[in-house]
């Protein structure tokens, strides 16, 4: 038999008149058949019932662009009205109009230290007219404006900390200090109302289409250190209710808005959050470590199938990787091959060379065609994922309604065999017409032949995507 226990980790409390508690949402899916059928039943259910919609329609593939680390400064602490508008114009001029223009941490007064959160207004030295001109520029060009917030973590001595000490949860250490960060008390309805009004006003004034919320703090000690006796779990439960109410109110007040949930990259991906938000930034680890990303994508495609990847490469000429390479390789085709996800951030910079823009303009259409199939098709991993530079990596997607799909094979930087044979999903009675958008090659195979093996020979540190059409389903 199977024993399953779920619930809030710590809960031992009495309730006061008028209070409610909210239990964690769960889904239990029964199925018959093999793992592949279960995987794709979940994906179909997730797309239909969990993934938020954009103006009532499924969210399509999104290409994101931004200006990260300008002048060597942290994150987005050096963004200005001028350099943002100039960068958008440069990308458009080079044929790279994004779906999303992304401004992350650092647009507020923080003295070039993005972690100083709690001064929630645009840095007047960088944005003398607020963020409205950037948002209007995006709207004019048909681009969605994404803006980062982290309202729950409040840095010591910022405006919010000073103006509303009654909303600050602190953890006192053994020396009597209360650290650098506080947790905003979203269990408090007045605090919720204040935050709703603030962010709603910014969404409207700055023409924000995607509200991005981060959460770079471990909240449990703050909750547990500020609870009444016999009320263990109350602060966590009421805080969770508060943040869900905050999001729900933003969505009601701003039709067409959608939310990107980050939470230190890949946390807070529970079903209640995922019903309201998309984890565009699914991790803070390994953006340019191709073999690590392959394992991450393997899990994301199966469980939370809308996410974003970067076209970053942290490998060196000797075949070794840096954990966090501050001087990554220029964007190339391999970086795109390893960033095939429903959403993508091209790391071609706005002031990059014509050669780099040429790579992007070559690969972006291939990514978009593949991404559409990632969202409409069933998913078939074709290799074991061991996070090894010595392995090949392969996957397949096929739209069951149209019969269109693709097979991707990537040869990692130290994979020694010169050829690789995958065993794709195929109908033995069908015929498949294949094409490679990069080389222009075409071929035809029967389903019976495909079941025996699909063999690819490519150089180290390269990849190939073979699109196909199952004959009779055009």
Where does each model-flagged region fall?
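Beta-strand-rich recognition/accessory modules
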Residues: 1-55, 78-81
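Aromatic-lined carbohydrate-binding/catalytic grooves of carbohydrate-active enzymes
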Residues: 58-197, 206-210, 222
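Histidine/acidic-residue-rich catalytic or RNA/ligand-binding cores of hydrolases
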Residues: 113, 157-162, 221-226, 268-279, ...
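N-terminal/domain-start segments enriched in small and hydrophobic, helix-friendly residues
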Residues: 198-241
């Amino acid at each position: 038999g199977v024993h399953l226990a779920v619930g809030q980790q710590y809960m031992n409390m009495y309730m006061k008149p008028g209070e409610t508690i909210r239990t964690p949402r769960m889904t239990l899916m029964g199925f018959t058949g093999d793992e592949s059928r279960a995987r794709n039943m979940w994906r179909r259910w997730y797309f239909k019932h969990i993934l938020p919609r954009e103006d009532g329609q499924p969210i399509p593939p999104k290409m994101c662009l931004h200006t990260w680390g300008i002048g060597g400064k942290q994150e987005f602490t050096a963004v200005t009205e001028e350099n943002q508008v100039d960068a958008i114009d440069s990308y458009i001029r080079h044929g790279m109009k994004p779906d999303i223009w992304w401004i992350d941490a650092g647009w507020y007064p923080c003295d070039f230290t993005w972690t100083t959160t709690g001064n929630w207004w645009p840095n007047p030295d960088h944005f003398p007219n607020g963020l409205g001109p950037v948002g209007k520029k995006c709207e004019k060009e048909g681009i969605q404006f994404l803006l980062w917030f982290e309202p729950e973590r409040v840095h010591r001595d910022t405006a919010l900390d000073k103006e509303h000490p009654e909303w600050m949860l602190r953890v006192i250490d053994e020396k009597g200090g209360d650290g650098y960060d506080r947790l905003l008390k979203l269990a408090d309805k007045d605090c919720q109302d204040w935050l709703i009004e603030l962010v709603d006003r910014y969404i409207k004034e700055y023409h924000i289409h995607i509200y991005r919320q981060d959460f770079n703090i471990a909240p449990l000690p703050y909750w547990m250190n500020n609870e009444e006796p016999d009320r263990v779990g109350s602060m966590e439960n009421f805080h969770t209710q508060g943040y869900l109410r905050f999001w729900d109110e933003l969505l009601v007040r701003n039709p067409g808005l959608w939310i990107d949930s980050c939470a230190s990259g890949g946390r807070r991906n529970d079903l209640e959050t995922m019903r309201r938000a998309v984890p565009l930034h699914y991790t803070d680890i390994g953006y340019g470590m191709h073999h690590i990303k392959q394992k991450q994508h393997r899990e994301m495609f199966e469980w939370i199938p809308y996410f974003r990847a970067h076209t970053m490469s942290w490998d060196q000429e000797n075949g070794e990787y840096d954990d966090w390479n501050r001087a990554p390789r220029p964007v190339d085709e391999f970086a795109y091959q390893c960033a095939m996800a429903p959403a993508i951030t091209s790391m071609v910079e706005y002031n990059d060379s014509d050669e780099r823009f040429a790579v992007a303009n070559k690969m972006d259409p291939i990514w978009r065609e593949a991404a559409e199939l990632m969202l409409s098709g069933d998913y078939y991993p074709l290799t074991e994922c061991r996070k090894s530079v010595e392995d090949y990596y392969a996957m397949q997607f096929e739209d069951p309604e149209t019969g269109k799909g693709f097979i991707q094979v990537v040869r990692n930087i130290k994979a020694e065999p010169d050829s690789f044979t995958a065993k794709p999903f195929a109908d033995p009675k069908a015929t498949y017409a294949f094409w490679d958008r990069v080389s222009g090659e075409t071929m035809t195979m029967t389903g019976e032949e495909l079941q025996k093996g699909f063999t690819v020979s490519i150089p180290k540190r390269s990849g190939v995507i073979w699109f196909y059409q199952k004959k009779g389903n055009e």
